[in-house]
Amino acid sequence: MKKLIKWLIEEDNPSVKFYTLTEILNEKTDKGAEDLLRKDIESCAPVSSIMALQENGGWWHEDKYSFSPLYKNTFWQVYFLSLLGATKQIFAVDKAVKLIIANMQSEKGAFPVHDRYTGNLICFQGMTLEMLLRLGYFEENFTSSLSAFISDIVYRNDFRCKYRAQFKCPWGAVKVLKALNLIPPEKRDHKVSDTISRAVKFLLSHDIVEANYPRKKMKSRQWYLFSFPRGFQSDILETTSALIDAGCKSQNSNLRNALKYINEKRLDDGKWKMEYSLNGKMLVDIEKNNKPSKWISYFALKSFIKSKFRSI
């Protein structure tokens, strides 16, 4: 494990270094130290590369605001930046978020999907909330209204999706769970806690590795390919990581089998590789496909340690 951690905290990927220090090693950093780490993230690729493509008006790709085209426009760049560790303290990021809020959020707090798919799809609502929370918008009304909308729609529909013939959608449940995990327990109201419980119950009620969630179509091969960053789809690693962040432990047999599956994909040198990539679809590539991945290795190692799956 020491060799793997040493690799993860190398200077060439300040984002993974930051998350490894804070989420795996649990190092307590004061504000000054955290600010320095965040500055490193901001000044290095791929964050700096994404920021360099931003137009003066605050947008990317085109001055239109929606979830389409996938992975190219303003929403997606800000979403990727949030995953990489950027925050609202970056003026240009805050400027872009204000454009997204002004042009995409409905009066109900939701972020409707248009174009090829339509409606308040739960996967995109979860991703948007995760983005806002990661960037540091915890207290803003636009965040709380989205969180409330998600809790209400989950209470009514329980993760059902019209594009899954009204069956419950595990991808949507994972995206929502990832977002709500970011809210400190002491700041969760009963609706947030109930939504987390519903997501956990649904995801664990079906075999994660077999992916035997209700469906009409064949299961997606994406479920078995570890990837970062993910779009609206999900995989076994992201699902397992979200459940563990929600407090689930390896004593659960379903989760333990998923952890075993993740462990079986470990390379001989103790790392994990990127098995699917959005490179070529995004404006800026992140790592390399079919090569050892610091991001995939970070999520796998964090899942093992937090779940107490095994001594590494």
Listing of model-derived features with the role each one plays in the protein:
Residues M1-I312:
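Preference for long, amphipathic alpha-helical scaffolds in soluble/luminal domains
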